[in-house]
């Protein structure tokens, strides 16, 4: 997989980015620099969406901003899009401004209600903002650069408190930080109604800090917490974030995002989608997802870490870190990683599984119809660490992937560990290494296959019987009375 990363980066670098339109003043310099970086990245924010079967879409398919290609969805979001030379805005803030109790309205096509540029600082308190446009186009220009967002900061700072933001237009993100823009927003309600309209959004290296927001989105490719090409940094403290649209996770992550004490809900998509060299850290959050069945996907998941090769994020290790709080799956399996390097860390999270609970963790190649990597060589390299964590469901791996799975500090797993070569092509030299410390327990529910097993803890079946452990050549290492067998290449008790 690490060798494949170099190949992916070369592939990504070949993506050509062409021009598009422009309308007001400012911000082209930063956009140009970020655009060059994005072109090298070689990804596209398709995660949220319902990507086209033959394109490089995001997992859920529709979150491909205009290009269509989220895990669920319709294709490549942004090949051929370049940064705008200018923006069209009702109010462009180019010097320090402070206002309170005002109402702002925007109705024109693909315009911003408020644009902060030229290093200015805007402070708004107790404000109302309405953006409505039936002719706006949304798509990649909105996802990557913030065209059509209600409030956009490209080179300056927007401090927003006690407001209400409502958008009813394609590409109508609530607030958007791009490039050298920073948004600090608190105690505000954001409602977006159409496609490609995230609640809070960063791209191109922007910075956003949110506190105690109430955010609800309804369109496709409209994650309540959303990022896109060029990434950025986002910190969220408190609040409620709900995504209702198809292909709209609660969190769509192509940035470095930290969320504390928030409620995060996706009613028509996976809970979380992370692509490429990006990270999501959750502490004491309540997170839930409900991905629909989709014939383009070879499985259903609640949290996905992957690489679509669409061009929206840099190839590299995807990181999901969750401590405390709860994670609820309404359909399919829990964690899926494919065509990427990934790191998962779970610490004392309350888990609620779907009725099917297809898997706890799937670390394999894929046969996704949108083409996430080359079939037969698109596995995952995954490090998964569970601390004080109860887990239920099977772990699935294949020979074109590598898995390092560690249980410690009183963790437990109830399930089988299965080598499934369905999407491994001609196979490879992958492995699944499992380490169980002396305080942790694996309750085996089916015959299992592990490359290297290190266990100073407990391994039994669901009746409390010891499980037979044998080598792949048939040599019995530990004879048990259970009907289940764990086959290993190597075994150690410490």
Functional labels for PLM-detected ranges:
Residues 353, 378, 382, 386-491:
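Extracellular beta-solenoid/beta-roll
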């Amino acid at each position: 997989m690490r060798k494949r990363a170099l190949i992916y980066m070369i592939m990504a670098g070949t993506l050509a980015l062409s021009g598009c339109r422009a309308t007001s003043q400012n911000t082209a310099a930063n956009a140009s620099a970020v655009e060059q970086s994005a072109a090298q990245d070689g990804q596209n924010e398709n995660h949220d969406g319902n990507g086209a079967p033959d394109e490089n879409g995001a997992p859920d398919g529709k979150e491909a901003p205009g290009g269509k290609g989220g895990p669920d969805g319709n294709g490549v979001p942004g090949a051929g899009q370049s940064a705008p030379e200018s923006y069209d805005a009702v109010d462009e803030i180019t010097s320090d401004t402070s206002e309170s109790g005002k109402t702002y309205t925007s109705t024109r096509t693909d315009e911003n209600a408020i644009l902060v540029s030229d290093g200015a600082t805007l402070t708004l308190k107790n404000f109302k903002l309405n953006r409505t446009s039936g002719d706006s186009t949304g798509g990649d220009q909105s996802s990557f650069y913030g065209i059509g967002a209600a409030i956009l900061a490209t080179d300056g700072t927007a401090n927003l408190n006690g407001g209400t933001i409502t958008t009813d237009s394609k590409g109508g993100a609530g607030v958007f930080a791009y490039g050298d823009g920073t948004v600090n927003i608190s105690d505000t309600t954001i409602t977006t109604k159409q496609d490609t309209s995230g609640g809070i959004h960063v791209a191109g290296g922007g910075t956003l800090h949110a506190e105690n927001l109430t955010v609800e989105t309804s369109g496709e490719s409209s994650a309540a917490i959303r990022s896109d090409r060029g990434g950025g940094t986002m910190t969220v403290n408190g609040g409620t974030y709900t995504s209702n649209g198809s292909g709209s996770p609660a969190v769509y992550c192509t940035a470095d995002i930290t969320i504390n004490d928030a409620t995060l809900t996706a009613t028509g998509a996976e809970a979380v989608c992370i692509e490429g060299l990006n990270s999501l850290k959750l502490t004491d959050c309540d997170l839930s997802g409900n991905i629909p069945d989709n014939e383009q996907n070879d499985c259903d998941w609640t949290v996905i870490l992957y690489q679509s090769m669409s061009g929206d994020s840099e190839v590299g290790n995807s990181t999901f870190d969750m401590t405390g709080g709860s994670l609820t799956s309404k359909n399919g399996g829990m964690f899926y990683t494919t065509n990427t390097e990934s790191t998962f860390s779970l610490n004392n999270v309350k888990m609620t599984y779907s009725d099917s609970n297809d898997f706890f963790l799937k670390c394999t190649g894929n046969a996704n119809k949108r083409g996430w990597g080359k079939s037969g060589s698109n596995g995952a390299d995954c490090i998964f660490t569970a601390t004080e964590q109860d887990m239920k469901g099977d772990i699935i791996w294949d020979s074109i992937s590598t898995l390092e799975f560690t249980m410690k500090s009183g963790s437990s797993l109830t399930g089988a560990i299965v080598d499934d070569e369905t999407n491994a092509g001609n196979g490879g030299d992958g492995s699944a290494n499992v380490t169980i410390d002396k305080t942790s327990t694996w309750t085996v529910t089916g015959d299992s296959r592990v490359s290297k097993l290190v266990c100073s803890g407990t391994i039994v079946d669901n009746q409390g019987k010891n499980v037979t452990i044998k080598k792949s050549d048939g040599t019995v290492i530990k004879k048990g009375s259970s009907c289940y067998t764990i086959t290993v290449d190597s075994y150690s008790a410490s």
